[in-house]
């Protein structure tokens, strides 16, 4: 019966440069969910404009007091929110805080974990304390004085300049000498008030998804990222300038180490739902593979061609069942 189904909001959009990317993830999720089991609605959130987007192009305003809306003269209340906001306010803990206040279960980690993973500098330093390999980095705040030569000496060249709190590679630059730092910082500060300057790690970039429920742990096959661009930037990520190989071409030993690291980081963070962890596999001084954590995406892209759906298919799983696992784990 229709009334026995859980009613789920796919919360997408957001306030960042990734708004349109998030909408695409929302549409992907809408196509993936088991509609025999759930009533699914797309909720577009941008600033103070929160509305349900219906298939026929019509919309209905969300009542922010209880996250409900009116359809055909009747109030519709949600049982669960699947958050696929990339960037603010869904990847930095703000949306999670709102849902906590109104006691609505949701798909992601909680406020603290979201805020910490959204800030790359904070995350790096936190995980380093648990023995996770990360690149050296420096944090600069808007208006803070800096010395290009000192940074070059401390971090080395080349390096990456990136917004400390952002995603989808907006505002990220690869810097090859000290003279390129100032323009790269200007670009990064357009996206965030804090910028991280991070040492370059030479190696193979991979990305791995994971989710855990009360019953099971599912570590998905890793994806290897091969791009002709300088790095895996926005153009490579969303305009097809990349080759994605799933499963990644890793030795069995390295693949096992990556999977163990992924599972351990998930537990360290007390993460929830499905997350994706990016790594660089470099070589240590003895020529052995070294697993370096690059960043964590707690609301990974969910279009048909995104990493997570690719990895789910490679694992021989059905994305519909994966999403049901994540939802039902909250009940």
State the predicted function of each range:
Residues 1-107, 111-112, 116-118, 122, ...:
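ATP-binding N-terminal substructure of ATP-dependent carboxylate-amine bond-forming enzymes
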Residues 2-12, 16, 24, 116-204:
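Active-site nucleotide/adenylate-binding loops and adjacent lid/helix of ATP-dependent enzymes
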Residues 88, 163-164, 199-200, 266-271:
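Short Gly/Pro-enriched turn/cap motifs at secondary-structure boundaries
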Residues 176-260, 283-292:
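Phosphate-binding site of ATP-dependent enzymes
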Residues 2-6, 131, 252-331:
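ATP-dependent carboxylate activation and anion-phosphoryl transfer catalytic cores
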Residues 40, 105-106, 134, 159, ...:
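Hydrophobic beta-strand scaffold residues
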């Amino acid at each position: 019966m229709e009334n026995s189904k859980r009613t789920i909001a796919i919360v997408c959009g957001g306030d960042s440069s990734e708004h349109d990317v998030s909408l695409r993830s929302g549409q992907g999720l809408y196509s993936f969910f088991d509609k025999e089991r759930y009533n699914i609605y797309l909720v577009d959130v941008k600033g103070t404009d929160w509305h349900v987007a219906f298939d026929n192009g019509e919309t209905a305003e969300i009542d922010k007091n209880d996250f409900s809306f009116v359809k055909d003269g009747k109030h519709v209340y949600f049982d669960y929110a699947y958050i696929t906001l990339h960037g603010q306010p869904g990847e930095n803990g703000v949306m999670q805080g709102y849902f906590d206040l109104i006691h609505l279960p949701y798909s992601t980690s909680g406020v603290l974990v979201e805020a910490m993973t959204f800030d790359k500098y904070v995350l790096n330093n936190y995980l380093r304390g648990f023995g996770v390999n990360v690149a050296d980095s420096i944090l600069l705040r808007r208006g803070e004085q800096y010395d290009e030569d000192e940074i070059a000496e401390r971090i080395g060249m080349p390096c990456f300049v990136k917004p400390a709190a952002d995603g989808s590679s907006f505002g990220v630059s690869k810097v090859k000498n000290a003279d390129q730092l100032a323009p790269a910082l200007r670009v990064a500060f357009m996206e965030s008030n804090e910028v991280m300057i991070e040492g370059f790690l030479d190696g193979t970039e991979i990305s791995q998804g994971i989710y855990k429920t009360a019953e099971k742990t599912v570590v998905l096959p890793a994806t290897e990222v091969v791009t002709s661009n300088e790095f895996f930037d926005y153009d490579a990520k969303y305009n097809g300038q990349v080759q994605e190989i799933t499963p990644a071409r890793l030795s069995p030993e390295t693949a096992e180490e990556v999977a163990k690291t992924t599972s351990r980081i998930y537990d360290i963070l007390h993460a929830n739902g499905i997350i994706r962890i990016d790594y660089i596999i470099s070589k240590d001084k003895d020529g052995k593979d070294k697993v370096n954590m690059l960043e964590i995406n707690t609301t990974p892209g969910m279009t048909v061609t995104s990493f997570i759906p690719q990895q789910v298919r490679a694992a021989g799983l059905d994305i519909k069942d994966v999403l049901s696992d994540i939802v039902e784990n909250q009940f």
